[in-house]
Amino acid sequence: MEGSDFLLAGVLFLFAAVAAVPLASRLGIGAVLGYLLAGIAIGPWGLGFISDVDEILHFSELGVVFLMFIIGLELNPSKLWQLRRSIFGVGAAQVLLSAALLAGLLMLTHFSWQAAVVGGIGLAMSSTAMALQLMREKGMNRSESGQLGFSVLLFQDLAVIPALALVPLLAGSADEHFDWMKIGMKVLAFVGMLIGGRYLLRPVFRFIAASGVREVFTAATLLLVLGSALFMDALGLSMALGTFIAGVLLAESEYRHELETAIDPFKGLLLGLFFISVGMSLNLGVLYTHLLWVVISVVVLVAVKILVLYLLARLYGVRSSERMQFAGVLSQGGEFAFVLFSTASSQRLFQGDQMALLLVTVTLSMMTTPLLMKLVDKWLSRQFNGPEEEDEKPWVNDDKPQVIVVGFGRFGQVIGRLLMANKMRITVLERDISAVNLMRKYGYKVYYGDATQVDLLRSAGAEAAESIVITCNEPEDTMKLVEICQQHFPHLHILARARGRVEAHELLQAGVTQFSRETFSSALELGRKTLVTLGMHPHQAQRAQLHFRRLDMRMLRELIPMHADTVQISRAREARRELEEIFQREMQQERRQLDGWDEFE
């Protein structure tokens, strides 16, 4: 692709994302499906703006690579060891059972047994990018089903190695392409990467961090991610697996959070590019000429994988309420199928349109997953949001709550317990199934679902409630919920959790004045205790705390118009200096007033 063409493609991708994703979110079909539809629109079978899909699809795999690096950072080696049973037990069983069933079905449709085996293995894999994205959107990350889903995806990445090695054997060209010496060298190189990463990465990042230049740290992070991806690609292994291992090696380092911050913007954009590329690769010509075959194939693929995953989840002991989430989120074909089927095609394992039909099936199955997860959400909502069971003893029998609490993590639980202790009627909205199960056992009135859905808020009693307390983890969810409440339930008093100063500014701009910055109050309290240990009078330390809180809040309000304007940063610094001067002046006055206090104690 020429340089100018590459730039044009970049502009088209950005335009497609900016136009399609907000529209998809407004229609309630999710960002992932929006990216896929945008790819269809600008691809060779849509408006035809971009024709070189294969090159862009390979480049867009970097989105999955960055995502796996961040996931690796969140898992330390001891946690990975704890997951070994689910990785090599459930993960291996899912791949083998799904591949066997799907290969058998392909043989019934005139595939040779060699092509059927490759097709079955490729179709058994799930989309790492899509599954992890949906798990995050649905709040499954910390649930049992989310942990099990991640284990299955990790085993699938490990299975890439033997699957690719199997292709030349099935094609009957093992002598020509299957070099055991070369494989041994690759294994040694892989082990060398593990050992080198274990002992070299932290000293290298310590040296880079000592420079104090943030841009260099970001560049080093990108070098690590891209370098490990290219190294694994050169070995013929999964790029995503390489960056995942790099992330795990740095999971216990002091640079973990800084690495996440440096990578996050690139991950989001490249993941969007990946989904757009998948949409572009959909061959509408094959879909048109083999419509019935493709539709049946997609239905059978999704049904077989759901059946296998559901049964494995049941055998593993996953709660019944979480099994459908686990099965649904992994029910699609994956990006690895594109690589495996291309390799098999180069070995002439497929005949006629077989490869094109398989790729169309995989692509369409990926498009069904967001819709399938919405159906699962509706089913779970009916199951959990219906009338209370007789054996449950809720604290409150009144159907009209005074307060709705959105999110029941550590922050929300403290608020909920305080309100319950004072006999307030509350209803909790939570999208983590495991949390819903636990809270209901303790008698909380909990609704499962996405609180940004107006119907759920209405059924939870928002029209009769007096206040809503928003404790969402994601700032985007908080602001969306504020907008919905102001539009549909204007009578509600909105109280919100702000994760930081930027979110506090956004809440103030939206008209929300009752909010709490999650670390501010506790930091101030610890600061007050520190002043006392340094010899300051307790009353004086208390006054210092109150002054600081009041003046900081005043500065927060004064800087609302410029919080997002980088040109105004200098003004923020001036305001901070002013705050310090006012603080020192008032504290000097306090000291004069307190000079004689100690002698009376």
UniProtKB/Swiss-Prot annotation:
Q: Which molecular function GO terms apply here?
A: glutathione-regulated potassium exporter activity
Looking at the keywords, is Cytoplasm present?
A: no
Q: Which GO terms describe its cellular component?
A: plasma membrane
Can you tell which superkingdom this protein's organism belongs to? Answer: Bacteria
What keywords are annotated for this sequence in UniProt?
Antiport, Cell inner membrane, Cell membrane, Ion transport, Membrane, Potassium, Potassium transport, Transmembrane, Transmembrane helix, Transport
Q: Name one GO biological process term.
A: proton transmembrane transport
Location within or outside the cell: Cell inner membrane
Chief location of this protein within or outside the cell: membrane
Q: Which PROSITE patterns match?
A: RCK_N (PS51201)
Q: How does it sit in the membrane?
A: Multi-pass membrane protein
Segments crossing the lipid bilayer: 4-24, 29-49, 55-75, 87-107, 115-135, 152-172, 177-197, 207-227, 230-250, 268-288, 291-311, 324-344, 356-376
The family note in this entry says: Belongs to the monovalent cation:proton antiporter 2 (CPA2) transporter (TC 2.A.37) family. KefB subfamily.
State its role.
Pore-forming subunit of a potassium efflux system that confers protection against electrophiles. Catalyzes K(+)/H(+) antiport.
Instruction: Outline the subunit composition.
Output: Interacts with the regulatory subunit KefG.
For this entry, the protein name equals: Glutathione-regulated potassium-efflux system protein KefB
Q: Which organism is it from?
A: Escherichia coli O1:K1 / APEC
